[in-house]
Amino acid sequence: MQGTKIRLLTGGLLMLATVGYVQAEALQPDPAWQQGTLANGFQWQVLATPQRPSDRIEVRLSVNIGSLSESTQQSGFSHFIPRLALTQNGGLPTMQARSLWQQSIDPKRPLPPAIVSYDYSLFNLSLPNNRNDLLKEALSWLASASGKMSITPEAVNHALQGEDMVATWPADTKEGWWRYRLKGSTMLGHDPAAALKQPVDIAQLKDYYHKWYTPDAMTLIVVGNVDSRSVAEQINKTFGGLKGKRETPVAVPTLSPLPTTPVSIMTDAVRQDKLSLMWDAPWQPIRDSVALQRYWRDDLAREALFWHVQQNLSKSNIKDIGLGFDCRVLYQRAQCAINIESPGERLNANLTTVARELAKVRDNGLPQDEFDALIAQKNLELQKLFATYARTDTYLLISQRMRSLQNQVVDIAPEQYQKLRQEFLNSLTVDMLNQYLRQQLSQDMALVLQQPQGEPEYNMKDLQATREKLMAPAPAAAAASNSAGDVAQGRSEATDIPPAQ
């Protein structure tokens, strides 16, 4: 959910000049999604996909609790509770429960049956299509795990002796870059992969489970070729009897702003040097048309910048360089990067090439012909919107829905998307994109180098000097950039929500 990559870069502080005067239109949730809240606070959302009859039925149960709410004595509880649940039958006969889980993993896209992070615990099931009996069993098992689990010394010992099938997000919580990013955050002392303290305090574990696993902190999502009304009735029958209510607010994870100090990090996550020029800004929810258009404008500018730089590198026949842009939303911060993958001996030279191209775009803007080609491409994509939506499978639909909920983005119907998107493309100009890029490329960037373990540490001062030499803005440009930033501070954003929802 968190940290999902998005296509390109981040930003956007141009509201007064572009869409600040536009009347904001509230985004209307897609009515295809049926949703409700039971009397005990349990929330559910169902999307029937008759256009995808052969797809698997995707089921997710998210519980709003993770390792961040653990005390020192409770370390490892949030990870262990799903592990314990996965060893129990959930009210089903033993062979029936075993068969359910054997069929609940998509062989093409296998997911761990449960994932635990700092602020959520998630159960994943992917069921064969046209198996309403399995869906009924899955809901029954989830309801049992959500409030009726057996927590005894025997059950705990049995779970500890078995395989731990619970994954964490991120997958490696001790990876060097991630630990660096957590500096200054309370998350640093609350590892979702932490081992359970021995001996286990059964009474304390039971209290933790009943305190946090309450129906008003749960959301069930089902996507597939199902009868929405029938599933809604089954949800009410299965989950309506869960007891409990949150009395203590859950801890909210936060990240500090990304430091702009150059840093080199040794990590097993890369096989060759990876240098990132990074931006970091608060993430803003997308609930109205102005926020959506602002994101679209920024997104197109990022895409245009990427292809402009990529094409110029290709024309120059630059070798031994891999260029990528990515962006992700991490705990309400939009973190984006221009990534340069390169052998160590070519790193400074390749940074020189990329920085020079970025400086040219900042100072001169993108040419009109590249802008026109981009708009033509986006208009063509828009014409294929409904065909694209029909090809979007249930796995992608549910993944997108969960990111929308995580990042406070309103999912809209394809019809509203088409209308707003066409209005946006018709009103956009190359000057709007260039003003955004000028501001974005004039601000301070973090310089982060990830190196494979065992390599000699690179001198970051050399890379910093190269970047500053090539990308230092002229005084007039710097003043204009600072002024724009002061006017619209905090409006920078990015999203990992694909557009065709």
Language-model segments: which ranges?
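Gram-negative bacterial Sec-dependent N-terminal signal peptides
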Residues: 1-23
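C-terminal regions of mature proteins
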Residues: 25-26, 219-224, 375-501
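Histidine-acidic residue clusters that define the catalytic metal-binding segment
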Residues: 25-34, 178-218, 252-254, 283-290, ...
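Buried hydrophobic packing residues in well-ordered domains
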Residues: 41, 61, 79-80, 123, ...
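M16/MPP (pitrilysin/insulinase) zinc-metallopeptidase core fold and M16-derived inactive scaffolds
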Residues: 58-126, 172, 187-191, 303-332
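Acidic/histidine-enriched segments that form metal/cofactor-coordinating
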Residues: 100-208, 352-356, 363-398
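Non-catalytic, conformational "gating/processing" segments within enzyme and secreted inhibitor domains
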Residues: 202-237, 442-446
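An aromatic/glycine/proline-enriched structural segment found at the starts
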Residues: 219-276, 280-284, 454-488
